[in-house]
Amino acid sequence: MSTLHKVKAYFGMAPMDDYEDEYYDDRAPSRGFPRPRFDDGYGRYDGDDYDDPRREPADYPPPAGYRGGYAEESRYGAVHPREFERPEMGRPRFGSWLRNSTRGALAMDPRRMAMMFEEGHPLSKITTLRPKDYSEARTIGERFRDGTPVIMDLVSMDNADAKRLVDFAAGLAFALRGSFDKVATKVFLLSPADVDVSPEERRRIAETGFYAYQ
């Protein structure tokens, strides 16, 4: 459109249909870059490229050996806490743990142990007494006076009576020039003057279970 025609159209001297405004023409702008209507192809994506949160999860095949569900209780049996039976707390015999207490170099040769109790050996007539109360002190004194080595097992006595009997035996050994030795807890050996029992023999007798030879 020429400039003259535009002036005529502005003052009403030319029909308005012939007036074309480049700023209102949506078909194609006359200058500048074309205005995209929707998109120019960049950033375009398909709906399939993104996961739909409402979509069901993929049904993957189960691992080999898996059968699903829970194990049948009848197949494996009901599982219950293991019940432990409390062992009977019986009082062990003194000789039983002594027989198993020594191993290796400290253990005495069984042949040497047997020789200690052969006829004619001082320990062959040794005796073991297990008094229940102090009234049995007389028996201990008579055996010791006759030249018999005596083992006093005071385990079954209460502490008060055991202490009295220990004092009695110590005085008895002193009066008759014997010896009085402790071989284990609440177990003592009274040896007459003519019976020589070395400390090593006393220890090994106790550790290897002297009570098996009484």
Swiss-Prot record:
GO terms for biological process: division septum assembly; FtsZ-dependent cytokinesis. Gene3D superfamilies: SepF-like protein. Homodimer. Interacts with FtsZ. GO terms for cellular component: cytoplasm. PANTHER family: CELL DIVISION PROTEIN SEPF (PTHR35798:SF1). InterPro entries: Cell_div_SepF (IPR023052), Cell_div_SepF/SepF-rel (IPR007561), SepF-like_sf (IPR038594). This is Cell division protein SepF. Cell division protein that is part of the divisome complex and is recruited early to the Z-ring. Probably stimulates Z-ring formation, perhaps through the cross-linking of FtsZ protofilaments. Its function overlaps with FtsA. Pfam families: SepF. Keywords: Cell cycle, Cell division, Cytoplasm, Septation. The keyword Electron transport does not apply. Residues 23-70 are annotated as: Disordered. The keyword Cell cycle applies. Belongs to the SepF family. It comes from the Bacteria.
